[in-house]
Curated annotation (Swiss-Prot):
The keyword Ribonucleoprotein applies. It comes from Frankia alni (strain DSM 45986 / CECT 9034 / ACN14a). Belongs to the universal ribosomal protein uS4 family. GO terms for biological process: ribosomal small subunit biogenesis; translation. This is Small ribosomal subunit protein uS4. The keyword Heme does not apply. HAMAP family: Ribosomal_uS4_B. Residues 98-164 form the S4 RNA-binding domain.
Length: 209
């Protein structure tokens, strides 16, 4: 599957906000957006007034980059959200949050969504006792997500277990049990508990044209 292979920090600078793509580095003064809070490139410091279309496009790109998704798959998620009964923007974020790689990240077992995606692809994650190696797999209410027993002594998961509770908070719709390397999915998230900083209405406006 195609994926972005460029510099993560340039993506944050391009969007002029932290996308939290580099794990704990994003919370330190070494984060490049703290040092150079302007877009990369020769004209990055220039001041431009974005058009309505560009604002919508940038918001879509920001959201896709946060979750590590390319355009074709992102558009597919939007089309699915648009067919649902609720607000399209809300439903889009619910779909993105229900991805397995996101749940591993949200549960604190990976420092970034990219690291979570790699853990899933390498076969280190189980859902309800069965190995799942597809990052886009959708979790459901009452699912149990856990790190496979053979993988629990790998360095990334030892670090996750030993530093549990020291970083970002686990959202209320999940329960993380670091001692068992397990995440309980109590429910699927409502929009008001999703802390992703995007204006989803701009995405809806872009795709509605």
């Amino acid at each position: 599957m195609a994926r972005y292979t460029g510099a993560d920090c340039k993506r944050c600078r391009r969007e002029k906000t932290k996308l939290f793509l580099k794990g704990s580095k994003c919370d330190t003064p070494k984060c490049p957006i703290e040092i150079r809070p302007y877009p990369p490139g020769e004209h990055g410091r220039g001041r431009t007034k974005d058009s309505e279309y560009l604002l919508q496009k940038r918001e879509k790109q920001k959201c896709a980059r946060i979750y590590g998704i390319l355009e074709k798959q992102f558009r597919g998620y939007y089309d699915e959200a648009n067919r649902r009964a609720g607000k399209t923007g809300d439903e889009l974020l619910k779909i993105l949050e229900s991805r397995l790689d996101n749940v591993v990240y949200r549960g604190g077992f990976a420092p970034s969504r990219d690291a979570a995606r790699q853990a899933v692809r390498h076969g280190h994650v189980q859902v309800n006792g069965r190995k799942v190696d597809i990052p886009s797999y959708r979790i459901s209410e009452n699912d149990i997500v856990e790190i496979a027993p053979k993988a629990r002594e790998l360095t990334p998961f030892i670090v996750a277990r030993e530093t549990a509770g020291q970083g970002r908070a686990v959202p209320a719709w999940l329960e993380s049990i670091p001692s068992q390397m397990r995440i309980l999915v109590h429910s699927l998230p409502a929009r008001q508990v999703i802390d992703t900083q995007v204006q989803e209405q701009l995405i809806v406006e872009l795709y509605s044209k």
